[in-house]
Amino acid sequence: MRHYEVVFLVHPDQSEQVSAMVERYSAIVTDGKGTIHRVEDWGRRQLAYPINKIHKAHYVMLNIECDGETLGELENTFRFNDAVIRHLVIRRDNAITEPSPLAKHDEKEGAAS
């Protein structure tokens, strides 16, 4: 099985459904005998450029380990979900479990406030 980093952007009107979406996608991975190493909810952020006249989106990142069939099923689910406006899957050499630089930065800002 290979390691992947998956980032998907959710339409801002659907932000309240993000936790249910993460559970659904996690279930797809675990049902395919994969594992989830890290889940980060980066929250609603400004987009670098508008996508379909949308200027903000809710970002979520997953680090998973699964086979190609499970990854294909996950990508199909992204493609047919209208709430997911973009997704990106990157193959990694190994599992990444420490917090991302963006999550570390958010933690520092939260502690400083």
From Swiss-Prot:
Example of a GO cellular component annotation carried by this entry: cytosolic small ribosomal subunit
Cited CDD domains: bS6 (cd00473)
Any single Pfam family the record assigns to this protein: Ribosomal_S6
Record carries keyword Ribosomal protein: yes
Protein's GO biological process: translation
UniProt-recorded Gene Ontology molecular function terms: small ribosomal subunit rRNA binding; structural constituent of ribosome
Stored Gene3D superfamilies: 3.30.70.60
Cross-referenced InterPro entries: Ribosomal_bS6 (IPR000529), Ribosomal_bS6_CS (IPR020815), Ribosomal_bS6_sf (IPR035980), Ribosomal_S6_plastid/chlpt (IPR020814), Transl_elong_EF1B/ribsomal_bS6 (IPR014717)
UniProt keyword terms in alphabetical order: Ribonucleoprotein, Ribosomal protein, RNA-binding, rRNA-binding
Stated role: Binds together with bS18 to 16S ribosomal RNA.
Family of this protein: Belongs to the bacterial ribosomal protein bS6 family.
Protein name: Small ribosomal subunit protein bS6
Gene that this sequence comes from: rpsF
